[in-house]
């Protein structure tokens, strides 16, 4: 199962992208398969999570951001029984 990251680049007063780059380096070095989606506006995390979890199959979604990002992603998950959230 491929990890799916929903990243808020503006979190931590703009440091979200820097934090993502550190995480991405570890993922690449470890050979872990992943997809990344960046939020572009308020509410976008919900839309992204909904789109991802409407697709068939199991999902492993990681929300990278603050409380607001996690809240948006949780609220967008459509099929909770097929989704692992981190």
Where are these regions (language model features)?
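Small-residue-rich beta-alpha loop regions that form the catalytic core of phosphotransfer
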Residues: 2-86
């Amino acid at each position: 199962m491929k990890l799916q990251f929903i990243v808020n680049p503006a979190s931590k007063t703009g440091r979200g992208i820097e934090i993502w780059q550190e995480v991405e380096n570890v993922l690449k070095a470890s050979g872990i398969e992943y997809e990344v989606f960046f939020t572009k506006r308020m509410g976008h995390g919900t839309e992204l999570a909904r789109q991802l979890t409407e697709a068939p199959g199991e999902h492993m979604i990681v929300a990278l951001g603050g409380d607001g990002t996690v809240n948006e992603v949780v609220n967008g998950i459509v099929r909770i029984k097929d989704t692992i959230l981190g």
